[in-house]
């Protein structure tokens, strides 16, 4: 889970930044492993702030929230709101089924253009570093 990743980064001396919706705060689910907490009203505000402050979005294995963030960034890029890209960090093939779905949608003509212009894939840490370089 994201909390485990934040703890590992925090414990290693890395900076961890959390964009925290008020509902998460109200429910007492804010990670204790944040170097910086940026409060926001809701998930839409969270995505807007993350997009505003990011150069690229690296998607680690995650659930529905991560999928929401991936597709928000990719979809808004396809229609010209920004030129930011998503990198799926495909640790142990985690994103393989999503990649297969995207390939199928591409083949069926449901995605205009090449989705790889907006969503890139890194199957290893070396590939991730290369894409970020």
Where is each model-derived feature located?
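Glycine-rich oxoanion-binding loops at beta->alpha junctions
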Residues: 19-54
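Active-site/ligand-binding-proximal alpha/beta "capping" segment
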Residues: 44-80, 87
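Anion (oxyanion) recognition and catalysis
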Residues: 6, 10
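Short, aromatic/basic amphipathic alpha-helical patches
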Residues: 98-108
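Short, small-residue-biased leader/transition segments that mark boundaries at the very start
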Residues: 1-2
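Short, acidic/small-residue loops that bind anionic groups at enzyme active sites
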Residues: 19-21, 60, 76-100, 113-115
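A charged, well-structured terminal subsegment
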Residues: 52, 56, 107-133
């Amino acid at each position: 889970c994201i909390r485990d990743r934040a703890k590992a980064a925090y414990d290693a001396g890395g900076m961890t930044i959390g964009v925290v919706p008020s509902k998460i705060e109200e429910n007492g689910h804010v990670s204790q492993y944040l170097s910086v907490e940026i409060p926001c009203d809701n998930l839409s505000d969270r995505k807007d702030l993350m997009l505003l402050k990011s150069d690229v979005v690296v998607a680690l294995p995650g659930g529905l929230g991560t999928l929401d963030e991936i597709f928000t960034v990719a979809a808004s890029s396809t229609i010209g709101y920004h030129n930011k890209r998503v990198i799926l960090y495909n640790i142990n093939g985690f994103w393989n089924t999503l990649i297969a779905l995207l390939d199928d949608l591409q083949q069926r003509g449901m995605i205009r253009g090449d989705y790889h212009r907006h969503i890139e894939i890194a199957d290893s840490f070396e590939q991730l570093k290369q894409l970020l370089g």
